[in-house]
């Protein structure tokens, strides 16, 4: 067991003859005790410091181990992240290449489809254009034939009979008129003894005005039907037929009118 400063201070020595001076020994012991106490105190402080340093060293060792472990984990994580990023980048590049190839194929297909449709449309337009040209040629030929046929009708000699003056026409048709009137009335028509002059100032009766108005309406209707027939013949050519003068209906109407007046 180590000696303490108190034991040094309380230490007593036996005396002998011609021994050391007790006072000097006590003074020296006091000095030794003081220095020893200082040494013990310093040693204690150093032990405390050493302990503190050892604790700090242990703490730093733990931190070092933790940091080393963290570094290892970080390195491992970084390596795994790097590997995952590399794999992901490769996957992205591969997927992008596949998408680009797919888009390229789709673009080529659509371009070919558009080109095919454009070609088909161009062919269709060309065919339709040719059909329109053929129809135009047919229509032109029909129109030409119709116009020629109408011109032939207009230039026909039959129009001379139609366009003759009324007096001449009535004179040349007198016999036919008499026959029709005789047939309608059921009695022969006597020869006129003397022609009475036509009274241009005579006023028409209400019945005559209505009959005249009815005849005008009938004539307008026949004119409209004739114009419609001409228009239809222009659109759809028909064989050329020479105009025939329909004298009988008009003569019959006149004869009937005369019979009613009687």
From Swiss-Prot:
Listed InterPro entries: DivIVA_domain, DivIVA_fam
Gene Ontology cellular component terms for the protein in this record: cytoplasm
PTM annotation: Phosphorylated on Thr-201 by StkP in vivo. Phosphorylation would regulate the scaffold DivIVA function directing cell wall synthesis and the formation of mature poles.
GO-annotated biological processes: division septum assembly; peptidoglycan-based cell wall biogenesis; regulation of cell shape
Chief location category: cytoplasm
Modified residues (Phosphothreonine): 201
Disruption phenotype: Inactivation of divIVA results in severe growth inhibition and defects in cell shape, nucleoid segregation, and cell division, since it leads to the formation of chains of unseparated, morphologically altered cells with incomplete septa, often devoid of nucleoids. However, a further study showed that the anucleate cells observed in the divIVA null mutant (corresponding to 15% to 20% of the population) were indeed dead cells in the process of lysing.
SS bonds (residue pairs): none
Compartments where located: Cytoplasm
Keywords: Cell cycle, Cell division, Cell shape, Coiled coil, Cytoplasm, Phosphoprotein, Septation
Pfam families, per database record: DivIVA
Domain of life: Bacteria
Impact when changing residue 201 to A: Loss of phosphorylation. Cells display severely altered morphology compared with wild-type strain cells
Coiled coil: 34-135, 199-236
Protein family (similarity comment): Belongs to the DivIVA family.
Function: Appears to have a multifaceted role in controlling cell morphology, completion of cell division and separation, as well as chromosome segregation, through a complex interaction web. Seems to be primarily involved in the formation and maturation of the cell poles.
Subunit architecture: Interacts with itself and with a number of cell division proteins, including FtsZ and Spo0J.
Protein name: Cell division protein DivIVA
Organism: Streptococcus pneumoniae (strain ATCC BAA-255 / R6)
Organism lineage: Bacteria, Bacillati, Bacillota, Bacilli, Lactobacillales
